[in-house]
Amino acid sequence: MKIKLVTVCAFFSFGLTALAQIQGDGGMPKSKTIQPAAVKTVLFQEPDVAALRAEDLINDAEKTGPWRFGYNNDTWMNMENSGEWYELTNGGKIWMIKLQCKNAYTVNLTFENLVIPKGNELYVYNEDKSFILGKFTGNHVYEGQLGTELVPGEVAIVEYYVAPQNTAIPVSLSIDKVTHGYRTASEYIEKGLNTSGNCNMNVNCPDGAAWGDQKRGAVMLVSGSNGFCS
C-alpha cells in the first residue's frame, strides 16, 4: 500500500503568541463582488472533543507520535460534485466553496489531484478575508498535493481562479481532508520543557553540537494534516 504524507512547514516565533509565516506568493482573491454569505457552504459537525482530548492525555504522555491538534474529516469534494462556478467580466471564472467546522478554533485543508496552470491562482481564506493564504500557483503543488496552514476560526473559503486565456484548459482540485482544530498552537507551545518525543534530539546536548546556528530558530511541522511536530 502506498501511503501519501502531506506535511506543511510553518515557522513560529516562540513568544507569548505564535505567528505563522503565511503561505503563498501574496496577492488578493478575485472574488471582489461575490459575498461570502452567498457561497455554498458545507457544514461539518463538531466531533466528540471530550473523547479526543481523553485520547490526547494518553498520547501526549507516551509521546509516541505528533501532538494532535485536529480531527480529520475525510472527504472527496471536487469541482464537479461540490462548490459553484462564477463567471467574471474579464472572461475568467472562479470556483468557490465555503467549509465550516462547527466550533473549531482553526480549519486547515489537504488538497489532492490539484492542477494549477500558469496564470491560474488558488486562495484559501477566512470569512472576512482578514487571513488569506495564497496566491498558490503550480510551483506550490507537489505530485498534485498541497496542505494549507491553519485558518483561524471555523470557516475556510476556497477560491480557484481561472485566467481568461485558460478557460479551455482542464483544471482539477479535490479536497481530501478538512481538519477541525480543537486544540491550538498556543497549547502546543505552552506544553512546557522536557516534553519532546523520543524521535527528537536536544540541540543543546553534545549530539546537537553541529547545529549551533539552526538551534536559534524553531520550526513547527503539520504532520498528517492534524498533528504538530517541532
Give, region by region, the residue ranges found by the protein language model.
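Bacterial Sec-dependent N-terminal signal peptides
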Residues: 1-25
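Domain-level representation of secreted and single-pass membrane ectodomains enriched
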Residues: 21-230
